[in-house]
Curated annotation (Swiss-Prot):
GO terms for cellular component: nucleus. Residues 388-399 have a biased composition (Low complexity). It comes from Candida glabrata (strain ATCC 2001 / BCRC 20586 / JCM 3761 / NBRC 0622 / NRRL Y-65 / CBS 138). One of its GO terms (molecular function) is zinc ion binding. Residues 180-210, 369-440 are annotated as: Disordered. It is found in: Nucleus. This is Transcription factor BYE1. A zinc finger (PHD-type) spans 44-122. Residues 239-374 form the TFIIS central domain. Negative regulator of transcription elongation. Belongs to the BYE1 family. Residues 374-387 have a biased composition (Basic and acidic residues).
Length: 607
């Protein structure tokens, strides 16, 4: 029998590497345990109302009295300053009193904690952001459930002929760390995704085939009808719960405190701020959901509902909108009527008065001619259609009879049936242009109409393009592409993007990318929806991303302008001295208190 082979190593059964790791962990643990405790944070003076800080604070010479320390940030503020900021009424017996303890009790909450004005604001801001985040998250989940979208995301769009490898961000690529000027298009969560399936390569070497049974055809009897699957009430539960949370925050942190502060509302005995907020939020959410359901179908209900929540929240949060808050909290305004009000009606009185002022100025500036309209007269020649001329001496040109016979094709407001009294009204198309301030002879008006279909909020707008100019392009390049970039005028919606992000993007590429600017003027029949879209975009502080139609086009954005204010992007493109060949002419803009602009980013090197 052979002898077994034995090892003579003294370290048999031991792993030196693991031993070293174990010793390192023990040493690190001992260091953490024996680490000296941190020193107490140095006390800091920071009183925002009076501007007192450590740099200018002298304890013996301070004229504002005693201080109190915040339990969250450990900074010190004057008691009198905080009483004024928080608008706390001081009892008569404590006026001009030096009793610091009694005055301090007026600033503490039910938990005997005092928080400065900055900490309270940050807390409210965090709560508001959390509510917005939950609402957006539930909106995405609700849309996926309702629209029965596929779980996988759509493939990225890649232009093979583009050297810069343009792509449109999907949800999976929205947080890529590398920043490129093509990444500033945000896909909207509400878009219905296409179910793209990858094809499997065929293998000619495989001779055997597998038979796949055919699906049986669906048979519908006479007493059955094929209908769409309508979502149940449970599918809306998530988004409605988050909306109620936002409304509770709205009443608790903004409406009730502001009305109490201005003595226009009193809390009845047996009730508190929380119970009142819960009651109003539940009733208001129920009315709002019923209203949104009545004006939309089940596919667009979630998007319409969430946008309406945001509009109500932002307007009722406005400190200048005290009259609306008073009407709501005192039930002077019915909640059913409140949820059906437009963004313009919900705006604070200052904005509404400004709008009325602008409208009145436009009416006052309208000039109506005193002279009667020019008519046609017939010459004394034997031929009725020999020649016609204007009676106004400023018009001396004689028209050819052929021009009069072609009046229908040229949209001229005259007929030839009865030359003496044949003046007719202008066609509807000319009326719509005149009503909107569109000059048909303006060379900057493109000969193609735009059509914008924003189906997510059921807004479809039709109108005309007015070219404003470009940057970084010479005259030949501009003349070559200024009409080609819009193609047939159909603007294909891709997604929304925050205005701040779009402005930062334009600031980054303003010296390397050319930008063409247009004003979008609505037709008369679409003006109402056009203004609704402007208000909708302004409330969200968003721009709309359009799908590029040409290989040299990088991005297309639609901007909104309310009360005649020029968007920040156009201000950058017209005032920045670092931009070469600035050819954008703001004098071409039609004066409207609500208007839309289109900016097109192109690559000048491949134009």
């Amino acid at each position: 029998m052979e002898s077994l082979r034995k090892s003579s190593r003294s370290t048999k059964g031991k792993n030196t590497y693991l031993e070293v790791l174990r010793r390192q962990e023990e040493e690190e643990y001992e260091q953490r345990v024996n680490r000296p405790k941190k020193e107490k944070v140095q006390e800091i003076v920071h009183c925002s109302p009076c501007g007192t800080t450590d740099a200018n604070y002298v304890e013996d010479e301070d004229p504002y009295g005693e201080m109190i320390q915040c339990d969250q940030c450990d900074t010190w503020q004057h008691i009198n300053c905080m009483l004024q900021v928080k608008d706390i009424k001081v009892p008569k017996e404590l006026e001009n009193s030096d009793d610091v303890d009694s005055l301090s009790k007026l600033l503490v909450n039910s938990e005997d904690k005092y928080y400065c004005d900055r900490c309270i604001y940050k807390s409210q801001l965090r709560e508001e952001r959390r509510a917005y985040k939950e609402l957006n998250k539930s909106e995405m989940i609700g849309d996926n459930d309702i629209l029965d979208e596929p779980k996988e995301h759509p493939d990225e769009y890649v232009d093979d002929q583009d050297e810069d490898q343009d792509f449109i961000l999907s949800k999976d690529t929205a947080n890529i760390a590398e920043v490129d000027d093509d990444e500033f298009v945000e896909n909207d969560d509400n878009r219905v995704k296409k179910d793209k399936r990858k094809r499997k390569p065929s293998n000619s070497a495989i001779t055997t085939t597998k038979t796949v049974p055919k699906k049986k055809a669906r048979v519908i009897t006479d007493d059955q009808t094929e209908t769409e699957t309508i979502p149940s009430e449970d599918s809306y539960a998530k988004v409605r719960t988050n909306a109620r949370k936002m409304l509770v925050t709205l009443f608790k942190n903004y409406i009730i405190p502001d009305t109490l502060k201005n003595n226009v509302f009193e809390i009845v005995k047996g009730h508190d701020e929380q119970s009142i907020s819960d009651e109003f939020a539940e009733e208001m959410e129920s009315k709002l959901f019923s209203h949104c359901r009545s004006i939309s179908n089940y596919k667009t209900l979630i998007s319409v509902y969430t946008e309406k929540v945001r509009v109500l929240f932002s307007n009722l949060k406005d400190p200048k909108n005290l009259s609306l808050k008073e009407a709501v909290i005192n039930r002077q305004l019915d909640l059913e009527q409140l949820v059906s009000m437009s963004a313009t009606d919900l705006a604070n009185p200052d904005l509404q008065s400004m709008k009325k002022k602008i409208d009145s100025q436009k009416i006052d500036s309208l000039v109506i001619p005193n002279q009667p309209l020019d008519k046609l007269k017939q010459d004394n020649s034997e031929d009725d259609h020999n020649s016609f001329e204007f009676t106004n001496p400023t018009f001396t040109k004689t028209f050819n009879p052929k021009d009069i016979h072609e009046s229908n094709s040229n949209n001229r407001p005259y007929t030839t049936d009865s030359p003496t009294n044949s003046y007719t009204d202008e066609p509807d198309s000319m009326k719509s242009d005149s009503n909107n301030g569109v000059d048909t002879n303006d060379q900057n008006i493109l000969n193609v109409k735009f059509k914008l279909d924003y189906n997510e909020v059921d807004l479809n707008v039709v109108g005309t393009f007015k070219f404003l100019g470009s940057t970084l392009l010479d005259e030949n390049q501009e003349h070559k592409i200024y009409q080609a970039v819009v193609g047939d005028g159909k603007l294909i919606y891709e997604g929304r993007l925050h205005t701040k992000i779009a402005t930062e993007y334009i600031s980054e590429i303003k010296t390397t990318r050319a930008v063409l600017a247009y004003q979008l003027l609505p037709s008369a029949s679409h003006r109402e929806k056009y203004e609704q879209l402007v208000e909708f975009m302004d409330d969200l502080d968003r721009v709309l991303g359009m799908k590029p139609r040409k290989p040299y086009v990088k991005n297309m954005y639609i901007l909104s302008s309310l009360l005649g204010k020029l968007p920040d992007i156009l201000q950058i493109l017209t005032t920045d001295e670092s931009i070469a060949k600035k050819r954008i002419d703001l004098s071409r803009i039609n004066d409207n208190d609500k208007t839309l602009y289109l900016v097109v980013v192109v690559k000048p090197e491949i134009v």
